[in-house]
Amino acid sequence: MANIKSAIKRIDVTKLETARNKSKKSAIKTFIKKFEAAIEKNDKEDATKLFNLATKKIDQAASKNTISKNSAAKKISRMAKELNKLA
C-alpha cells in the first residue's frame, strides 16, 4: 500500500479511470454485437442505424485514448465492409 499522499490519490484516480474505460469498452462491444445480429438478419436499415451509433461510440473512445486510434479504425473498417456486403 502506498504511503505517500499523491500516490494514494493516483491509486484512487486509476481505479476510477479503469472503471470508466471498462464501461466504454463494454458499450462498444454491445453495439458491435447488435450490429452483427442485424447483419445476420439481413436488416440493412437497422444495421445502418447501429453502424452509425457504434461508429460514434468507437470514435469517442479513440479520442479519449480508451482504445487506440488504429484499433478504432480497424473495428469501423470491418463493420463497414460487412455493411457494404449487405447492399
From Swiss-Prot:
PANTHER family: 30S RIBOSOMAL PROTEIN S20, SMALL RIBOSOMAL SUBUNIT PROTEIN BS20C. The keyword RNA-binding applies. The gene is rpsT. This is Small ribosomal subunit protein bS20. GO terms for molecular function: small ribosomal subunit rRNA binding; structural constituent of ribosome. It comes from the Bacteria. GO terms for biological process: translation. Belongs to the bacterial ribosomal protein bS20 family. Keywords: Ribonucleoprotein, Ribosomal protein, RNA-binding, rRNA-binding. GO terms for cellular component: cytosol; small ribosomal subunit. Pfam families: Ribosomal_S20p. Binds directly to 16S ribosomal RNA. NCBIfam families: S20. The lineage of its organism: Bacteria, Bacillati, Bacillota, Tissierellia, Tissierellales.
